[in-house]
């Protein structure tokens, strides 16, 4: 249903290999469960390399896709995403916000609480910092 390839947005991306219907669960965001405190240390290392791989699950728990992650960590940010996040039973699911065409890159809004250290490249002219 999906595959990792080069992306125009940022490095690698995830693409649909077949049409994906609206609201379909596509993949879960996998990684090591760590404390919020530990994630602050790791995020600094990742951000220096231009990556955002820590996903806040709760106020105390973060999923670090840099350790034990799957291809979901390569789904890029977009200010106009075609996917959304759905957290069920402590599992972070990426779901289709609309029907996604074959060959289309999957994106979701990272909606970060960060310091705006990474320039958004979701489309030409986007000036947002994530």
Regions found by a protein language model. Give the residues of each.
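Conserved catalytic SET/PR domain of SAM-dependent protein methyltransferases, capturing the structural core
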Residues: 1-130
């Amino acid at each position: 249903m999906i595959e990792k390839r080069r992306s125009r947005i940022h490095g690698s991306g995830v693409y649909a290999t077949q049409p994906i219907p609206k609201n379909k669960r596509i993949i879960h965001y996998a990684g090591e469960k760590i404390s919020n405190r530990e994630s602050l240390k790791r995020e600094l290392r990742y951000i220096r390399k231009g990556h955002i791989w820590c996903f806040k699950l709760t106020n105390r728990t973060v999923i670090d896709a840099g350790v034990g992650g799957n291809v979901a960590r390569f789904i890029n940010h977009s200010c106009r995403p075609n996917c959304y996040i759905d957290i069920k039973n402590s599992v972070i699911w990426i779901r289709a916000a609309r029907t996604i065409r074959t060959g289309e890159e999957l994106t979701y809004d990272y909606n970060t609480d960060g310091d705006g250290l990474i320039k958004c490249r979701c489309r030409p002219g986007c000036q947002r910092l994530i």
